[in-house]
Amino acid sequence: MTHGDNRDGPGRETRSSGPLVLASASPRRVDLLAQIGLVPDAIDPADLDETPAADELPRPYAERVARAKALAVAPRHPGAWVLAGDTVVARGRRILPKAEDAKTAKTCLEMLSGARHRVIGAIALVTPEGRLIERSVVSQVAFKRLSAAEIAEYLAGDEWRGKAGGYAIQGRAAAFVRWLEGSHSNVVGLPLFETNALLAGTGYRPGRDG
């Protein structure tokens, strides 16, 4: 596989035919792609039931959801590169939910306090030829022990809302992290090195206007 250093330099302005479609409504993934010079031509999130199956393990679950997103959206965009991702926070074999309310976020933070957890990032790409390519990445994160006051103060904001595991490492929760092993961007929402390499390896080249 080739890695994405072909984006460097002013002379490389061509792109293989076909647009890039992001099968996600996550603003974090849009921002992360922008960091490496990738701007989707379209954003078309998949509407899926993302409930884990009984006894489904975290990594296979993340891979299944990313794959399902890409395959659901690809038929709507023939001739495009369709990129999908899924991020899962796991403590042991347990998949932590996306926190949609403060009670859920509090439960997640209490579970993560003083402990190590995994963040699994799965990406799936459907090429213009209809080929499905998948990758998954695991980052290890260790939180310091959180006091009740620290948790309450964090929950008083809203950056936890909608986040897997009830926290956003790119925000105030960065102060909770004792150490991190692996991809930081994966913990934010998309493993950029692997995403860039996957796209470059299939012939995608970002276009540039002007």
Swiss-Prot record:
Keywords: Cytoplasm, Hydrolase, Nucleotide metabolism. Residues 1-15 have a biased composition (Basic and acidic residues). Residues 1-22 are annotated as: Disordered. One of its GO terms (molecular function) is UTP diphosphatase activity. GO terms for biological process: nucleotide metabolic process. Its main location: cytoplasm. Its EC number is 3.6.1.9. It comes from the Bacteria. It is found in: Cytoplasm. It catalyses: dTTP + H2O = dTMP + diphosphate + H(+); UTP + H2O = UMP + diphosphate + H(+). Its cofactor is a divalent metal cation. The record marks R28, T87, Q170 as: Important for substrate specificity. The active site is at D86 (proton acceptor). Belongs to the Maf family. YhdE subfamily. Nucleoside triphosphate pyrophosphatase that hydrolyzes dTTP and UTP. May have a dual role in cell division arrest and in preventing the incorporation of modified nucleotides into cellular nucleic acids. HAMAP family: Maf. This is dTTP/UTP pyrophosphatase.
